[in-house]
Amino acid sequence: VAEDIANVELRPTFVSLVDDTGTGQDVIDKLARHKVNTRYIQRVPDGMGTWLAVFNNEGDVVAAISKRPDTNPLTDLLAEKGDEIFKDCDGIAIELDLEKDTVKQVLYFAQKYHKKVYAAVSNMSIAMERRDFLQQIDCFVCNQQEAGILFSDEYDHMGPEEMCRTLAANVGSARIPCMVVTMGDKG
């Protein structure tokens, strides 16, 4: 996401963890080449975890395994430098399935400095346990399959208009302020 933001000529700051290996340094170097501020990326053992997803021919995830990294160093960084990081930012993009304490810290600084928060997820089952966070952010971004998981419904057969009508009711009843659902080649 930080790289995509930089590619449209904005200058994001990326706050994250990477492995303390050559791979972690490669991530930092690539982001820096795209003019992403990498000052707040910390190098820690196993900082990126391990992720594997298996997709079917239609592009849907059919299996996934993961080993989440310990993000306590990120929580510590926010406790130490949160004011410095957030006071002058334009908005905040966060992965909502980070450790609860980390998300709470980010939401605290967002409220303190009146910043909008845009959230995505990589593990919908974790996000499902944190529905209260969805009510505290400004906009939740997910794909059609993730929206179906969130609302315990099947959306794959829906076109954009039907999806919009159906989601409007669900988003309102869930008290989510705003939600963007990507639909692959459908919009």
Outline where the language-model segments fall:
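Short acidic active-site motifs
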Residues: 81, 102, 126-130
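Conserved phosphate/ATP/ADP-binding segment of small-molecule kinases
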Residues: 107, 111-187
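Glycine- and other small-residue-rich loops at beta-strand/loop junctions that grip anionic moieties
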Residues: 16, 41, 94-96, 119-122
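Conserved N-terminal subdomain of the carbohydrate kinase-like
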Residues: 7-90
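Aromatic/hydrophobic pocket-lining residues that form π-stacking "cages" and hydrophobic walls in ligand
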Residues: 27, 105-108
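Short beta->alpha connector loops
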Residues: 20-21, 97-101, 121-126
